[in-house]
Amino acid sequence: MVNKIPNTDLTLVDTPGLIPKGRISDMVCQDCNLNIVPSKEISRMTFKMKPNKVLLFGGLMWIKMLEVEEQNEEEKVKPIFTAFASKGVVFHETNEDRVEDMIKDHTGGILTPPCNNCKDEYRELAFKKETWTLDTNEELVFKGLGWISVKRGPLKIEINAPEDAEVILRDAFITPKRAR
């Protein structure tokens, strides 16, 4: 649909139905999509996790903390990061050895989204593992779901997400008043 805007040289072109690729929110049912896409205030939680701990974003994807090899014992600091997503997405911290059981037994229950209606179809998607190292004031975006922002780095993680999910590294939108 093309509309000429009166009293201007502007023309508005509407392209309904064009869906950008790579959004996790498009890989679930409509009800889950409504829970993933923020409509009001978003949820945020700050974490200071040890290596081999895992943070689940509902039953949609998870990130595992890895050890940063470059640091010597005197320089070792625990990374601090904040996770952001819609209030409809549950953050859950667990041990690495419990992830498979948590996903199998609790997706659609305490781990939402996905819901019981689309969890089986979602689990059939091919998943990928990627390793990322982020520095202070960098963010990793999980397109169509949320992001993490590193407050104190370096943060080395392994992400487990659907193969078609796009992951983007960017500078932090909001930075602390002073770097630590």
Range-by-range predicted roles:
Residues 1-180:
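Helix-rich effector regions associated with P-loop NTPase G domains
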